[in-house]
């Protein structure tokens, strides 16, 4: 177990703000169950073939009732993978049963970027949003983008992280 790996994710959330409802704009405070889930996923590591410590788990599945912060948590985790997970040029895909649902997650991440505690110089931001194509880009080539759930047509991207919202509603999953 590598507590520092999990703690890095938890500390990242302290830079973010909530994006929806009455908490919009307030600091993102993880609930205990969210912290424990992050610790269980990001903290458990194994040695790979090259002798590097890597995450043991590759899939994080979160199923809880509506209005419990799933979308905001997913948006924050997506931003973590885009900005802080250590990949040089990360590619984070946002998928949902339809484009409208995927855009809900994108809008939460966008709000977090635009209202974050991470200070960015206005003339050259590290992260910027492009609404016309529903994507968040980093100055270094990282990308977080909305895709349809038609996975068969998604040849090319080598995703660093994939965020799937409303998975229970997908046909043929």
Task: Please describe what each predicted stretch is.
Residues 1-173:
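Phosphate/NTP-binding elements of NTP-utilizing enzymes
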């Amino acid at each position: 177990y590598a507590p520092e790996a999990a703690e890095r994710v938890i500390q990242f959330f302290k830079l973010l703000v909530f994006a929806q409802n009455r908490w919009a704009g307030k600091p993102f405070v993880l609930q205990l169950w969210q912290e424990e889930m992050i610790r269980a996923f990001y903290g458990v590591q194994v040695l790979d073939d090259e002798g590097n410590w890597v995450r043991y788990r590759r899939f994080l599945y979160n199923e809880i009732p509506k209005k419990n912060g799933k979308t905001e948590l997913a948006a924050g985790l997506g931003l973590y993978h885009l900005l802080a997970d250590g990949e040089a040029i990360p590619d984070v895909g946002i998928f949902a049963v339809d484009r409208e649902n995927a855009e809900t997650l994108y809008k939460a991440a966008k709000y977090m970027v635009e209202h974050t505690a991470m200070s960015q110089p206005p003339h050259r931001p590290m992260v910027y949003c492009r609404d016309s194509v529903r994507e968040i880009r980093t100055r270094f080539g990282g990308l977080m983008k909305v895709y349809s759930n038609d996975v068969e047509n998604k040849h090319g991207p080598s995703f660093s992280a994939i965020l799937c919202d409303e998975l229970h509603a997908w046909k043929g999953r």
